[in-house]
Amino acid sequence: MPLAFMLPPNVWLADVAPTSLYGYQPKLAPAGIFVALFGILFIAHSIQLVYYRQWWVLLMPLGALAECGGYIARIYGHTHDRLRDPYVAMEVLLVVTPVLFAAVHFTSIGRVATLFPRRYSIIRPIFVMPLFVTVDVISLVVQAVGSAMAGTSDTADDAQSGSNVVVAGVAVQLFGYLIFDLVFASFWWRVRKDRPPLLQKYESFMLAVFLSSMCVVLRSIYRVAEMAVGWDGVINTTEWCLYSFDGAFVVLAVFILNVYPVGKYLPKKFNWKYNPEVDGDEETRKALWMEGIPDADEEKMASSQPATMDTEPTSVSYTHLRAH
């Protein structure tokens, strides 16, 4: 059950304030709760970042910190609900920040897919990260521009124009996520069908990333609906909706990757075509010998990494295995 539904009604129901930029006077208690939650998640992800030293995962603590900043701006808006700057800061941070988590989802699944034989992926794993992160960046820019337009507008028409831009940005993000989920579902079905040795090591992590991504998808659906009915529509001017369908889902998405930290499961040394750290594992070497090298140039690997086993002739090459 979303966090907001567990709070007493007098805590998460806003006082109606038609002259407020929010359409109500924001409550302190729920905003404070989310500041605390995202603050804790920021600390936890920062510790894991230093411990596992996968520096690209810096996006997770940065995202948690940005969410925290968005709710701090909301707290300030409790007593300054007619000031534009804290309102714009809140909207931009809360609308745009999940894009950072999306980049982690796309990159994580792309890297995991690279560790498996190429035949499991309908899109070459080397293209997963740049393709979906590019879509992610486009949605980031569009959402940021739309949020700034709506937040700094002086008329209802200008605010609605900003809302429309935000809807377009969130729709781009949602579209990218849905395509990504289809790619992942295809990969997951094929891997589950064959059950290669590596699946046991990465199965729970892949499911965790998928669940985390679905939380962001549900949050994005809420944002599209919110902006579709207007900046001053019933969803945007109803406070508990924000905490239930945005804050709670984003907290859950970030928390899941605390329980299943990216740095713990993905190898530190990584190459999109060939991963020496993983391929050095005996079990993985055996899997590669039996199933083919994922995303590697066969001739290059045949000359530099001959595949032999005690029970087979030592002259057997990867190219020969692929032919059979």
What are these regions (language model features)?
Residues 70-78, 143-153, 217-230:
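Helix-to-loop junction signature of class
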Residues 40-62, 105-135, 184-212, 264-271:
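Helix-loop boundary elements of multi-pass alpha-helical membrane proteins
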Residues 2-98, 123-126:
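Membrane-proximal first intracellular loop
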Residues 94-98, 163-174, 203-261:
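Extracellular loop 3-seventh transmembrane helix
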Residues 26, 87-94, 132, 158-175:
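Transmembrane alpha-helix entry/boundary detector in multi-pass membrane proteins
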Residues 40-46, 95-119, 137-151, 175-191, ...:
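Cytoplasm-facing ends of alpha-helical transmembrane segments in multi-pass membrane proteins
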Residues 318-324:
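Conserved small/polar residues in nucleotide/adenosyl-binding loops
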Residues 271-304:
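Non-transmembrane, juxtamembrane loop and terminal tail segments
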